[in-house]
Amino acid sequence: MRKKIVVGNWKMNNGVAASEQLAADLLAALGSSFTGCDVGIAPTFLSLTTAGKVIAGSTIQLVAQNCHYENDGAYTGEVSAAMLKGAGCSSVIIGHSERRQFFGETNATVNLRVKKALAEGLDVILCVGETLAERESGVTGDIVSAQVREGLVGVSDISNVVIAYEPVWAIGTGKTATSAQAEEVHLMIRTLVTELYGEPAAQALRIQYGGSVKPSNAVELFAMPNIDGGLIGGASLNAADFVAIVQAAAGK
């Protein structure tokens, strides 16, 4: 039985004070030893240490939104995996659709980041997903398969990898893939991972859904056999909504 995982991706929202308050609100609502599912929050780089101090010693994990694939150097505006580890992060989101869309990340550069993060001892949330045009063209399977295959090149052990399926057309649009649509892609991903890494690894792999998950649809989505939690955007900025989604994942 895979333990569900819910991560709040705060994106470029909340300053330091607001991040501290939201982290405190979540801690107060969930408690310091919540074990119903794995829970993480991903503040901006600027707020990582502040939010991290609030949740230190609790079961809420500190997650980064991105990392660079080099250790250090002349990469203005970037942050290395080792720096994130040193700041208290346990995981990092890599390959989010917004990184691919707005910052030119490719499957190849995503793969470099994945390997560097794993080498530095961070767990990885690898994001994959198709655009509306790709879905309507019937190439969802091809796109997502390529993102998984190429994102994991050279990775022999995926025990510290979570895959997040985020249909780009359902992010921040109010549109949500039906539970059946999401489950179809999640099953396809698990089948592909079985081919690449074998049945035990594929069955252990957790696959999150990330596309306008809300308290109103979380229970139905999380009831699907291959949906193992959520990567939550907008709803994670509201403590009550995020807690409701976490409770849905925990079956409460």
Swiss-Prot record:
Keywords from the UniProt entry: Cytoplasm, Gluconeogenesis, Glycolysis, Isomerase
Gene Ontology biological process: gluconeogenesis; glyceraldehyde-3-phosphate biosynthetic process; glycerol catabolic process; glycolytic process
Active site location: H96, E166
InterPro entries for this protein: Aldolase_TIM (IPR013785), TIM_sf (IPR035990), TrioseP_Isoase_bac/euk (IPR022896), Triosephosphate_isomerase (IPR000652), Triosephosphate_isomerase_AS (IPR020861)
Swiss-Prot/TrEMBL catalytic activity: D-glyceraldehyde 3-phosphate = dihydroxyacetone phosphate
Gene3D superfamilies attached to this UniProt entry: Aldolase class I
Enzyme class: isomerase
Cell compartment(s), UniProt: Cytoplasm
SUPFAM superfamilies in alphabetical order: Triosephosphate isomerase (TIM) (SSF51351)
Lineage: superkingdom: Bacteria
EC number: 5.3.1.1
Pathway stated in the Swiss-Prot or TrEMBL entry: Carbohydrate biosynthesis; gluconeogenesis; Carbohydrate degradation; glycolysis; D-glyceraldehyde 3-phosphate from glycerone phosphate: step 1/1
Binding site for substrate: N9, W10, K11, G172, S212, G233, G234
Keyword DNA repair: no
Keyword Membrane among UniProt keywords: no
Molecular functions per Gene Ontology: triose-phosphate isomerase activity
Chief place where the protein resides: cytoplasm
Membrane-spanning segments: none
Family: Belongs to the triosephosphate isomerase family.
Summary of the function given for this chain in its UniProt record: Involved in the gluconeogenesis. Catalyzes stereospecifically the conversion of dihydroxyacetone phosphate (DHAP) to D-glyceraldehyde-3-phosphate (G3P).
Record-linked HAMAP family: TIM_B
Subunit annotation: Homodimer.
Protein name from the UniProt record: Triosephosphate isomerase
Organism of derivation: Chlorobium chlorochromatii (strain CaD3)
